[in-house]
A protein has these predicted regions:
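Composition- and surface-driven signal marking solvent-exposed, interaction-prone regions
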Residues: 1-3, 16-18, 24-27, 41, ...
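Extracellular, surface-exposed repeat/solenoid domains
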Residues: 1-107
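Residue-level detector of buried hydrophobic side-chain packing
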Residues: 5, 26-30, 64, 161, ...
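Structured core elements
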Residues: 6, 12, 63-65, 160, ...
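Outer membrane beta-barrel translocator domains of Type V secretion systems
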Residues: 94-291, 407-431
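Short glycine-enriched loops at secondary-structure junctions
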Residues: 243-247, 299, 356
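Outer membrane beta-barrel transmembrane domains
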Residues: 274, 310, 314-431
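Internal active-site segments that recognize and position negatively charged phosphoryl groups
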Residues: 289, 294-300
């Protein structure tokens, strides 16, 4: 403007939709004849409190400078949110996230920080720990001396194939999101019985889909399994055990979207599961019915490789801590032959059991992550697995011929923080 500008009264500023303000300077008054006076008050209450506005008065003009105001961490309410906010608060203004984040209001920040956290990655490690039981259960269910009625119980070679499917849920809590994993797979094995021992090997493939709906995040995991197992029976006492290795190819995707910002993120990385397990039990009863109290202990270790997400400013890089979990289960199993009055032996058996499972070690897993082009790391947790759970199993076993057996089974785990259901069908042959 020409002439002189005289300032006074109250300056009220209103935001313009679609405009980022952080780090900007706005020359809103220019007077060729000079500027005199100052505003008595300023009102920037329509803007986010994460922005700080200051006026700079010059001889011929006045401008508004915009800097960071309150920290994002001041609006966070959970450990994961505070961790993410702490890293975002120190990002350079030109690193993509600070400008849209500082447009938000406190009530909007919590959900946005959760979406940025990348907690899918530590939750994936715990989902693999939970899913390790499918291979373990398959190996332990192969028992020395299992023969059809009237068949020779001597040395023999057996082969089997098993299809399985399962669903597990980690409930999460105020800090972490509910995580759901759906698994399917196919296992094959071959074993040999000699001198009361049964020794075998197994291999298989499968797929696990991990989803966090509240975080708009998911992982698709291709699994390859290898294992070895052995068992022996001394009268009623049975001892079973084995080891297994699994390789996982993880493909993760996350979608982050909030007012003024969106990003699609993806990553590919490998993971490994190692487990060793042993089970002892004593069976009371005969060939037609029996009870077996048992104790099982398993050690499961999961390692995830380096995570490097592709995408925009919300992409993360880092790693998940190695996971080591010990699972102990004590329970009671039963089996009962089902036969008609005219049959001498039972070719069909009902099997089941109930037990108590306790998990110790790494029940809560953490990841050390950082935003793209940043070295400031933050630590986030994934949904924990239950420390205590009730386990249940139920199934039917049928001898189709003296050398062929078909098994149908269900097993489940019911904990206060997680649940797991699985079903399987197995065909086996002796020759």
């Amino acid at each position: 403007m020409t002439g002189t500008a005289t300032l006074g009264g109250t300056l009220v500023a209103l935001p313009e939709p679609g405009t980022y303000y952080l780090g900007e300077q706005f020359n809103f008054i220019r007077a060729d004849g000079g500027v005199s006076g100052q505003f008595a008050k300023t009102d920037f209450s329509a803007f986010s409190p994460f922005l700080q506005f200051s006026l700079a008065y010059g001889a011929n003009g006045t401008r508004i400078d915009v800097a960071r105001g309150a920290s994002l961490a001041s609006a966070a309410t959970t450990p994961n949110q505070r961790a993410v906010a702490g890293a975002a608060d120190v990002l350079a203004i030109n690193q993509g996230l600070p400008k849209p984040l500082t447009q938000l209001f406190p009530q909007q920040v919590g959900g946005v920080l959760d979406g940025l956290s990348g907690e899918l990655h530590p939750a994936t490690a715990l989902a693999l720990v939970e899913g390790s039981r499918y291979v373990r259960d398959a190996a332990l269910s192969r028992r020395a001396g299992a023969t059809a009625p009237g068949a020779d119980a001597g040395d023999a070679t057996g082969a089997w194939v098993q299809a399985l499917g399962g669903n597990s849920k980690l409930d999460g809590n105020a800090n972490t999101a509910r995580t759901e994993a759906n698994s399917n797979g196919l296992l094959v094995g071959i074993d040999r019985e000699f001198s009361g021992w049964q020794v075998g090997v197994l291999a298989g493939t499968g797929r696990t889909d991990v989803k966090q709906q509240d975080r708009r995040a998911k992982s698709k995991i291709d699994n390859t399994h290898f294992g070895a197992y052995a068992s022996h029976t001394w009268g009623g006492f049975g001892l079973r055990g084995g080891v297994a290795w699994s390789k996982h190819e993880v493909k993760s995707t996350r979608d982050v979207a909030f007012a003024g910002f969106s990003d699609s993120l993806s990553a590919r990385y490998d993971a490994r599961t190692r487990q060793a397990f042993i089970e002892a039990g004593y069976r009371f009863g005969g060939p037609e019915a029996g009870l077996e109290p048992y104790l099982q202990v398993a050690r499961v270790e999961v390692d995830l490789k380096q995570i490097n997400e592709r995408g925009g400013a919300a992409a993360l890089h880092g790693e998940v801590d190695d996971t080591g979990t010990t699972v102990a289960t004590a329970g009671l199993r039963f089996d009962k032959g089902l036969k008609a009055s005219f049959q001498q032996d039972s070719w069909l058996h009902l099997r089941g059991g109930v037990g108590y499972r306790r998990a110790s070690g790494d029940r809560n897993q953490v990841a050390n992550l950082a935003f793209a082009n940043s070295s400031t790391t933050f630590v986030v947790e994934g949904a924990p697995i239950a420390d205590n759970a009730v386990v249940a199993e139920l199934g039917l076993s049928a001898w189709l011929t003296p050398r062929q057996q078909l098994d149908l089974g269900y097993s489940g785990q019911y904990g206060s923080e997680s649940r797991d259901h699985s079903a399987n069908v197995r065909w086996s042959v002796r020759f």
